[in-house]
UniProtKB/Swiss-Prot annotation:
Residues 66-111, 172-197 are annotated as: Disordered. GO terms for cellular component: cytosol; nucleus. Pfam families: HLH. Expressed constitutively in leaves, stems, and flowers. This is Transcription factor bHLH57. Keywords: DNA-binding, Nucleus, Transcription, Transcription regulation.
């Protein structure tokens, strides 16, 4: 057999190995123990079997053994640090149970959302300002103390209440026109600044479930009609035209603690009609429609008298 060495070659090889090396290599020692008397053996088959046994032992030696075990790249020498161990598996499971953080948004997306929010807010404010301007244009200036949103809304509420009361007074007047009125004759009470004429002045007073209405004057003189509902007064004055007449009348009416909320002026030939919407302020001494109609009648008669005397003095 070509793979087997002769006894002489083995002897030469064993002569070159030191004692220390022979002690470390167990297969060679076993070989020497097995082959004590090589020349005394008469059976060549026994010698061949011994050599085969030696080669088998050499193949199993720790010096010549080659391991073909492939190491897992994820496996470590320390079993405690191996992620496939029991503790490692628990750690992986615990990591999977953690709450996933939300991915950060893109800067462009964040900027887009911010610009959209700004545009929506600007549009809302623009619409609100348009509504407030429309509401402001429908109200008299006397209801607007300031130009802020709260004042405009509060003034609109007050104006609506005034309109409701005016509507009630007009409905009362309409019902009153359908009933019989009892005229009464009264004399005009003159003051130090008022010259009373000799003409008779008729005064009509009617009551209704919504308020009290009084008429004062008639004919070619100043005619005043007042309707009182709680602390609101609807006043209508018909008189002849006069220079700066309405300005003086407004000043005198406000001196009576009557706040002018609304004023409408219409004319017919030589006469002019003033429609006032008044509110009785604190400290107003006039409490009834008769008192208000009488006071306003005196104011316009005084103004017309002053105009008449000024015209006479010029001539």
């Amino acid at each position: 057999m070509s793979g087997l060495m002769s006894f002489g070659e083995l002897e030469d090889q064993f002569g070159q190995i030191s004692d220390t090396t022979m002690e470390e290599k167990i297969p060679f020692l076993q070989m020497l123990q097995c082959i004590e008397h090589p020349f005394t053996t008469t059976e060549p088959n026994q010698f061949l079997q011994s050599l085969l046994q030696i080669q088998t032992l050499e193949s199993k030696s720790c010096l010549t053994l080659e391991t073909n075990i492939k190491r897992d790249p994820g496996q470590t020498d320390d079993p405690e640090k191996d992620p496939r161990t029991e503790n490692g598996a628990v750690t992986v499971k615990e990591k999977r149970k953690r709450k996933r953080t939300r991915a950060p948004k893109n800067k462009d997306e964040v900027e887009n959302q911010r610009m959209t929010h700004i545009a929506v807010e600007r549009n809302r404010r623009r619409q609100m300002n348009e509504h407030l301007n429309s509401l402001r244009s429908l109200m008299p200036p006397s209801f607007l103390q300031r130009g802020d949103q709260a004042s405009i809304v509060g003034g609109a509420i007050d104006f609506i209440k005034e309109l409701e009361q005016l509507l009630q007074s007009l409905e009362a007047e309409k019902r009153k026109d359908g009933t019989d009125e009892t005229p009464k004759t009264a004399s005009c009470s003159s003051s130090s600044s008022l010259a009373c004429t000799n003409s008779s002045i008729s005064s009509v007073s009617t009551t209704s479930e919504n308020g009290f209405t009084a008429r004062f004057g008639g004919g070619d003189t100043t005619e005043v009609e007042a309707t009182v509902i709680q602390n609101h007064v609807s006043l209508k004055v018909r008189c002849k035209r006069g220079k700066r007449q309405i300005l003086k009348a407004i000043v005198s009416i406000e001196e009576l603690k009557l706040a002018i909320l609304h004023l409408t002026i219409s004319s017919s030939f030589d006469f002019v009609i003033y429609s006032f919407n008044l509110k009785m302020e604190d400290g107003c001494k006039l409490g009834s429609a008769d008192e208000i109609a009488t006071a306003v009648h005196q104011i316009f008669e005084q103004i017309n008298g002053e105009v008449m005397w000024s015209n006479l003095s010029r001539t």
